[in-house]
Design a protein with these regions (language model features):
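Extracytoplasmic c-type cytochrome modules immediately beyond a signal peptide or single-pass transmembrane anchor
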Residues: 37-147, 164
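The canonical Cys-X-X-Cys-His
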Residues: 148-160
Length: 164
């Protein structure tokens, strides 16, 4: 009997650790990193800057969701509302840039309908996160945060070149 309890506790702990690791990986993946090997023109630079401008709020929310920082309802509400606004800006910079598109793959423009569907999925996930944040219900928030991160990953996997 104790082995079953230990096994269930171990499974629950492993599930929590996996979830925390996944959230951390998604957050880091969304942050970007060093200089890309792909050339960037001014539109691409603006797009990158707009994506990076979203990260302080997303990272702050992630720390609370993962339990790395105490959950502060008001701080989370504000971060989610700000993130909902700043998350719209990068998508105003997806014109092709003849000076270089950075890590954006040609599929962004050659499969514009699929890219638009990913953008819409992301916008819906962000709105769901903001709505959940305004309720203050942490379990709803965790699910919505995870969905938002998964939406980022889905788009990056299809439309962004890996870092070299």
């Amino acid at each position: 009997m104790n082995n079953k309890i230990l096994s269930q506790d171990t499974k629950a702990m492993n599930t929590k650790l996996f979830s925390a690791a996944l959230l951390a990986a998604l957050t880091l993946a969304a942050c970007g990193g060093g200089a890309p090997a792909q050339p960037k023109g001014p539109i691409s630079e603006d797009r990158t800057a707009a994506f990076k401008s979203m990260m302080p709020e997303f990272s702050s929310m992630g720390k609370m969701v993962k339990g790395e920082e105490p959950y502060d309802v008001e701080k989370f509400k504000q971060a989610a509302a700000t993130f909902a606004e700043t998350s719209k800006k990068p998508f105003t910079f997806f014109q092709s840039d003849d000076k270089g598109n950075g890590r954006a793959l040609p599929a962004v423009w050659s499969d514009a309908a699929k890219f638009k569907a990913e953008e819409d999925k992301f916008a819906a996930a962000v709105e769901k996160l903001n709505a959940a944040a305004q309720t203050g219900k942490l379990e709803e928030i965790k699910a919505a945060y995870s969905e938002t991160g998964a939406s980022c990953k889905s788009c990056h996997d299809t439309f962004r070149a890996p870092e070299e």
